[in-house]
């Protein structure tokens, strides 16, 4: 299986697989969009999703999940607030389910122009990094390294120690020997609008895509070559396309047949362009 996309909800999609290397996904946000099918999530749904993901991951497997919440009147008498659901989900998955949370990440994207009275424009979304204990997780961020254009000469650099004192050392490693400028940080920026992403993904018309560069980085960083990537909310097929483009297998599902068809067609078209280039 190079890729397979089925029409099913997340419980069915995740119910028949095991030994997954990476789940890369963005589930519906609570009280945000309905996707024309009355689909919204509450805390119980997120709990069920976490349980299902934990079951399908192999020991040492990783889940990267982009999850935010809109501004609403969530609490009586408090006025409008940014929803706290993402952080409740993170704590629930860590404390109740048992996921390891190595760090916190951020998915940056330009918010819609506007005045935003009383708050700032939202240009990022929480990106949660979960690991299933039991084995060493795959992690290789060299895929995000870029050449600096020159070989750096060793030089004296300083850094602050935990006790507050400043230490000194001579720079070394790939930054010096190969002229590598490392790009991997906690923050990924990516736009999904016209002329900012792959045209086949932009033209899909999905209302809640994430950037293909973000998906490509996550897949190469957290899933070994020929490993299995899963997205139970496949949408336009960004995760699927980036998985097969970068030598990983993919399995995913969506509750709407139109997105299953579009994502499958996008992946098939890319494979055909490789197998039959003329």
Give the label of every model feature segment.
Residues 265-278:
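Conserved phosphoryl-transfer catalytic core
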Residues 1-262, 268:
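Core catalytic lobe of class I
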């Amino acid at each position: 299986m190079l890729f397979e996309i089925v029409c099913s909800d997340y419980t069915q999609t995740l119910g028949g697989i095991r030994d997954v290397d990476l789940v890369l996904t963005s589930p519906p946000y609570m009280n945000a969009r309905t996707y024309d099918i009355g689909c919204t999530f509450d805390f119980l749904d997120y709990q069920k999703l976490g349980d299902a993901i934990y079951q399908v991951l192999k020991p040492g497997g990783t889940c990267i999940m982009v999850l935010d919440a809109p501004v609403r009147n969530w609490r009586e008498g408090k006025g409008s607030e940014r929803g706290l659901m993402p952080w409740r989900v993170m704590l629930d998955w860590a404390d109740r389910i048992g996921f390891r949370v190595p760090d916190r990440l951020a998915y940056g994207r330009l918010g819609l122009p506007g005045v935003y009275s009383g708050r700032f424009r939202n240009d990022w979304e929480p990106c949660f990094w979960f690991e299933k204990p039991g084995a060493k997780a795959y992690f290789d961020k060299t895929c995000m390294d870029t050449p600096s254009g020159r070989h750096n000469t060793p030089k004296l650099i300083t850094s602050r120690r935990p006790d507050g004192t400043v230490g000194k050392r001579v720079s070394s490693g790939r930054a010096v020997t190969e002229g590598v400028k490392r790009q991997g940080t906690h923050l990924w920026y990516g736009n999904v609008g016209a002329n900012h992403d792959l045209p086949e993904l932009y033209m899909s018309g999905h209302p809640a895509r994430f950037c293909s560069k973000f998906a490509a980085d996550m897949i190469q960083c957290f899933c070994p070559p020929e490993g299995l990537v899963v997205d139970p909310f496949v949408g336009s097929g960004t995760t699927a396309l980036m998985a097969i483009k970068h030598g990983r297998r993919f399995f995913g599902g969506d509750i709407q047949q139109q997105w299953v068809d579009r994502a499958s067609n996008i992946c098939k078209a890319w494979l055909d362009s490789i197998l039959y280039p003329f």
